[in-house]
């Protein structure tokens, strides 16, 4: 079996990650340093936990020899090939106001519909204020409502969860909406399954 190693970056904050700016300087240096440490420990895959970290993909990947996945948004070119009609793909993100083209690692986002959690959702409040107490039932309901809105208003046929904090609600959203829901966990599983003998 495989095991996971979780490392919290000393310099990272929610405000640093969920930003319209490209990450550089000491935080980017720390990401590379931690990735190299994980590689030295024998990790065969390195990921982040924030979908806004796409802009660091090429820099971190250039510094390690193992696969590096910065964001679930790396799924976009594949899904745009499979779901080819405009508005087929929706993205549920932590904050749609901060999500910019550079977060998509250079991939075309034309025809993709973005919906955010920002404003009055429970998950947004808890993450942005770094609280620990979460009303799970309310969060699940609001995540499902946001995806339902993407379906009702735009006719999306699949959704990418940008934020890994959305992953616990994936099965509920799939059951409630009957559409395909993708996240970072799917990218990790894709890699894991490819290594199985």
Regions found by a protein language model. Name each.
Residues 2-45, 49, 59-62, 193:
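Metallocofactor- and cofactor-centric catalytic cores in central/energy metabolism, strongly enriched
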Residues 138-155:
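A short, acidic, amphipathic alpha-helical segment used as a generic capping/interface helix at domain edges
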Residues 156-168, 185-197:
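C-terminal and late-domain segments of enzyme folds
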Residues 88-92:
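Conserved beta-strand elements of the Class I
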Residues 59-83, 174-192:
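Short, acidic/small-residue loops that bind anionic groups at enzyme active sites
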Residues 81, 101-104, 171-172, 194-195:
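Short, well-ordered secondary-structure micro-motifs
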Residues 45-57, 69-75, 94-98, 162-168:
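Gly/Ser/Thr-rich loops at beta-strand to alpha-helix junctions
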Residues 1-26, 93-134:
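N-terminal glycine-rich anion-binding loop in soluble enzyme alpha/beta folds
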């Amino acid at each position: 079996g495989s095991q996971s190693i979780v490392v919290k970056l000393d310099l990272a904050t929610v405000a640093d990650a969920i930003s319209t700016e490209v990450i550089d300087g000491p935080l980017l240096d720390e990401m590379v340093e931690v990735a190299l440490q994980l590689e030295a420990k024998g990790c065969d895959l390195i990921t982040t936990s924030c979908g806004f970290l796409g802009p660091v993909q090429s820099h971190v990947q250039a510094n390690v020899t193992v696969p590096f996945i910065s964001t679930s948004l790396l799924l976009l070119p594949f899904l745009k090939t499979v779901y080819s009609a405009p508005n087929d793909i929706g993205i549920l993100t932590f904050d749609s106001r901060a999500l910019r083209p550079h977060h998509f690692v250079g991939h075309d986002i034309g025809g993709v519909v973005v919906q955010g959690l920002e404003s009055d959702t429970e998950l947004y409040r808890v993450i942005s204020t770094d609280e620990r107490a979460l009303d799970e039932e309310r969060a699940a309901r609001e995540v499902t409502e946001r995806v339902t809105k993407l379906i009702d208003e735009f006719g999306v046929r699949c959704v990418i969860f940008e934020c890994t904090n959305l992953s616990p609600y994936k099965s509920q959203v799939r059951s409630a909406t009957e559409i395909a829901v993708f996240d970072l966990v799917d990218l990790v599983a894709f890699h894991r399954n490819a290594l199985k003998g």
